[in-house]
A protein has these predicted regions:
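Non-catalytic cap/lid and distal C-terminal segments of serine-dependent acyl enzymes
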Residues: 37, 52-551
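Positively charged n-region of N-terminal signal peptides that target proteins for export
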Residues: 1-4
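Contiguous beta-strand segments within globular domains
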Residues: 26-34, 41-48, 198-202
Length: 551
């Protein structure tokens, strides 16, 4: 899933076409072009046409599985002023243009601009490249977009849109007394992609950091994307409250605790590591994304430990993450058990691919439907409410992603997993785990994912004789019993595997939020976790190691 902090995080209700109005009686086609003033040369990319029923916001800012209707077309060296056609042949979500109810809409078009890259593996591909900072196509620097235009669909004819605007660079946050920003070019990733690739870090410094120039501090890698613990020195509308959904406090309330004398002195670090396929690399080596795992452990973390006074020993490195970051946390702990001292894994993306949410990718033949009896089948859900109401299905999300990009370039969730876990296809792009329109599972891809260690339960079980002794005391799992994305199921699987572990027998710590705790549930406030992490490091500090950070 997307990390806990996201400008375009999914909302709670699915978009459903209601046929109060009949489908378009006459075919409507759109001709979309871009102005030479916006882009002077031919471009390759993905044209996304958005039709919204509301004028409350720009349609491009509403794109999501429960948002407006969207339609996608690939562009191959489209010239300025040359029209690209969006008609009934274009793939659409949640329906085709022909089946869209007739009526008035607010139309806007965006071009996600691609760059040709020559990877070290010999493949030449077209993908959206940036500097490694988190962004989505709606706001990505250099992408083109049109003005919003009110249109009528259903009476035929041609509607023309012109993309005249170029998205500017997003503002960068400035360093403060407490928060520092560092950009590190990875030589390993630069070699893989054939162009400079950066990983960006945001560090939260402890109270007294400047006044103790000879003190080195434990590190907590909170593997989200924003400032660690949502730290903010500015009061907000949620100040003074605890979120009933997450159980966490506001960033300002955390700041008020961070500066107290009772708070452990830690350096908290978050990372930005956007790839062409998703806003996060998952911090592992990948055939499609490149050696992000090696880059982070061998290049990024040592550079941070040198620039900031961070203890350079395993006992003082703690990992914490939720959702995407939860999977990262466990994967990094399993792959580098001698480098990290502990892992707090919250509602991770699937860590047992027998529960790839509700799909067993090894045994099931189709990701979209579950057969029952001789004639019946049910749709596989992707998301639910904490009361069990299904709001998205696998079929819906797969189609949505197919609209946003071909060849795995949607930068959305299902295709993110394929890019991280899966093999490179013959065309140089990620080979799909299943067909996006039929749901048929490719079991060769599933086997590749397992055999290359991305099914973390399978990886841990197969390597337990050497891995287990290095993990004892280090694993802490947390999940809501009604996780929105069914991620608790794979956590249960991992727990069962550990219950049967031998030599060593280690059951780890598992805490489940009950009753009806969803995907964003946390077992503690941010300040509460900082205290837990500090106490954990203190308890596991070897004799003779410096403890002057605990002032």
């Amino acid at each position: 899933m997307r990390n806990r902090i996201s400008s375009f995080a999914p909302l709670a209700f699915a978009f459903t076409i209601t046929h109060a109005a009949p489908p378009s009686a006459a075919p409507t086609r759109f001709e979309v072009s871009f102005a030479a003033a916006a882009h002077a040369t031919p471009l390759t990319g993905r044209l996304i046409l958005i039709l919204s029923k509301t004028a409350q916001a720009e349609p491009r800012m509403l794109v999501s599985p429960q948002g407006p209707a969207v339609f996608g077309v690939d562009l191959d060296q489209l010239r300025p002023a040359q029209p690209a056609v969006v008609d009934n042949s274009a793939i659409g979500y949640p329906t085709s243009l022909a089946d869209l109810p007739a009526g008035d809409y607010y139309a806007q078009a965006v071009i996600d601009v691609y760059t040709q890259v020559h990877r070290v593996d010999g493949h030449t591909i077209w993908v959206h490249m940036n500097d490694g900072r988190i962004e989505t196509f709606q706001i990505a620097e250099g992408n083109l977009y049109s003005d919003v235009q009110r249109v009528h669909v259903g009476t035929g004819g041609t509607i023309k849109l012109s993309l005249t605007h170029v998205m500017p660079a997003q503002p960068r946050e400035e360093d403060t007394e407490w928060v520092k920003h560092v950009s590190i070019q990875s030589q390993k990733l630069t070699q893989f992609w054939g162009r400079p690739i950066y990983v960006h870090a945001t560090l939260l410094l402890p109270k007294g950091y400047a006044e103790h120039p000879n003190t080195y501090y434990p590190s907590v890698y909170t593997l989200g994307h924003g400032t660690p613990f949502q730290f903010s020195t500015t009061p907000g509308r949620n100040s003074g409250t605890i979120s009933p959904i997450t159980g966490t406090e506001s960033g300002y309330d955390f700041y008020q605790q961070w500066i107290t004398d009772s708070m452990p002195r830690l350096i908290a670090v978050s990372l930005e590591q956007q790839t062409p396929y998703f806003p996060d690399s998952y911090s592992v080596n990948s055939a499609n994304n490149g050696p992000y795992g090696d880059a982070i452990v061998d290049e990024v973390m040592p550079a941070l430990e040198q620039q900031f006074r961070i203890i350079r020993k395993p006992y003082a490195r703690v990992l914490e993450g939720a959702s995407t970051s939860g999977w990262q946390t466990l994967a990094m702990m399993l792959q580098h058990p001698d480098f990290f001292g502990g892992a707090y894994v919250l509602q991770p993306d699937p860590i047992d691919f027998r529960h790839y949410q509700q799909t067993n990718i090894y045994a099931d033949s189709n990701a979209f439907s579950i057969p029952f009896g001789q004639f019946m089948s049910a749709e596989r859900p992707f998301r639910r409410t904490t009361q069990g109401q299904v709001v998205w299905t696998m079929r819906q999300l797969s189609r949505f992603e197919a609209v946003l990009g071909s060849h795995g370039r949607s930068s959305y969730q299902l295709e993110a997993w394929e890019a991280v876990y899966g093999p490179v296809g013959p065309d140089g792009y990620p080979r799909p785990l299943w067909d996006k329109l039929t749901g048929k599972i490719d079991h060769e891809v599933a086997a590749y994912m397992r055999d290359h260690g991305f099914d973390l339960r399978d990886y841990a079980q197969r390597n337990w004789s050497t891995l287990g002794p290095k993990l004892v005391g280090k694993l802490h799992f947390f999940a809501g019993d009604m996780d929105d994305f069914y991620l608790n199921l794979a956590v249960y699987d991992f727990q069962e595997m550990l219950k049967s572990s031998q030599n060593p027998h280690y059951e780890a710590e598992f805490t489940f939020g009950r009753p009806m705790k969803g995907h964003s549930w946390h077992n503690w406030t941010w300040a509460g976790f900082a205290r837990v992490a500090g106490a954990y490091v203190k308890a596991n500090t070897p004799p003779g190691e410096a403890t002057d950070w605990n002032y």
